[in-house]
Every structure is written in C-alpha cells, then in structure tokens.
Amino acid sequence: MLPICVVNNYGQFNHLIHRALRDLDIDAVLIPNTTPREEIASQYRGIILGGGPDIARAGVCAEYLDLGIPVLGICLGLHIIARKFGGVVHPGKSGGYGSVEVTIREHDDILSGYPDIIPVWASHADEVCRIPEGFTLLASSGICEVEAVACPRKRIYGLQWHPEVSHTVGGKRVYENFDAICTE
C-alpha cells in the first residue's frame, strides 16, 4: 500500500503530523511543498497539507487538489483548499494559538467517532469566512464559524485546528479516519 504524504508548509507542527501518523502505524512521508504533482499522483494514496505561516509560502500545494487523491488540510492547508475552490480567507479576530471548544455539526467520515463538543488547539491568525460551493460546514466554535469543512465527493477535508498537538483531545482519531478514507 502506498504511503500518505505530509506536505511541509513550514509550520511548526508539520513534523508532529508525520510523527502522529507513524505512532498509529500509518506509513507516511514528510515532503516539501514544491514536490511535483506527478510525483504525488504516482507515489501517495493521500495528502495532508500541513500548516504554515503564510499562503505565499505554500509552494504548489493548490495543484495537488486536482489529483483525485484524498486531501486533509490543516490550518493553512484548509485555507489553501478554501481559496482553490472559491472560498474566502481573511485575518482572524482572535489571532494566535490557544485552546478552543469546537462544536461538531456533522459527524461525517473525517469526524466520525467524535463527541459533539471537543477541546482543540487552534490558530486563528487567518480563517475561512466563506466556504466554497459544494463544501459542507462540519464544525464551528465561538470564535470561528468555520472550524472544519468537507467535500466528500472529492474526498477533500479541512480543519482549522491542529489534531497533531497533545492539547487537542482525541486528535489522532482524525488521522485514523483519514487513513480509512485513503484506503477505500
């Protein structure tokens, strides 16, 4: 079975995503965000777009979204997804990293097995203020309306929060769910 690639967008937690997958015995490779799309299409069964400081430093990540491979975007990864498909991203009102209670509105594939409210660790320096057409709002919080989205027919998912950090309760479940999506 092919591995899942974790695309390094220069975020401070990208290596933790890779480690979380390894800890779950999910074969994963951390790759630069300049990796050619042809290489992604032939060598990986899923793509995780990691977080990062700025969309201007996101390399060619937007090109990966047309490959037909399942994608999970985390923080900046969500913003890349939203912009690619016509959503709008703007500076967040809350800024920096911190604990947030997220309300799950829809327990779809990526959020399967979660309770209705979960404490997570998130950054809201930027956030999605309008989701793309064809996407479903999965979760929100008191400080950010768009905490998670999905387009199941494209197998594309995005989270504002960081499931890879220890402050996010049950964060590894997202990766288990994504692994299952990539195995279908």
UniProtKB/Swiss-Prot annotation:
Record keywords: ATP-binding, Glutamine amidotransferase, GMP biosynthesis, Ligase, Nucleotide-binding, Purine biosynthesis
Enzyme's top EC category: ligase
Reactions catalysed, as given in the entry: XMP + L-glutamine + ATP + H2O = GMP + L-glutamate + AMP + diphosphate + 2 H(+)
Enzyme Commission code: 6.3.5.2
Single annotated GO MF: ATP binding
Organism: Methanoregula boonei (strain DSM 21154 / JCM 14090 / 6A8)
PANTHER family the record matches: GMP SYNTHASE [GLUTAMINE-HYDROLYZING], GMP SYNTHASE-RELATED
Record's function text: Catalyzes the synthesis of GMP from XMP.
Record keyword ATP-binding present: yes
UniProt-recorded name of the protein: GMP synthase [glutamine-hydrolyzing] subunit A
Gene Ontology CC annotations of this record: cytosol
Top-rank taxon, per record: Archaea
InterPro entries the UniProt entry points to: Class_I_gatase-like, GATASE, GMP_synth_GATase, GMP_synthase_A
Quaternary data: Heterodimer composed of a glutamine amidotransferase subunit (A) and a GMP-binding subunit (B).
HAMAP family listed in its UniProt record: GMP_synthase_A
Pathway(s) the chain acts in: Purine metabolism; GMP biosynthesis; GMP from XMP (L-Gln route): step 1/1
Active site positions, chain numbering: C75 (nucleophile), H162, E164
CDD domains according to UniProt: GATase1_GMP_Synthase
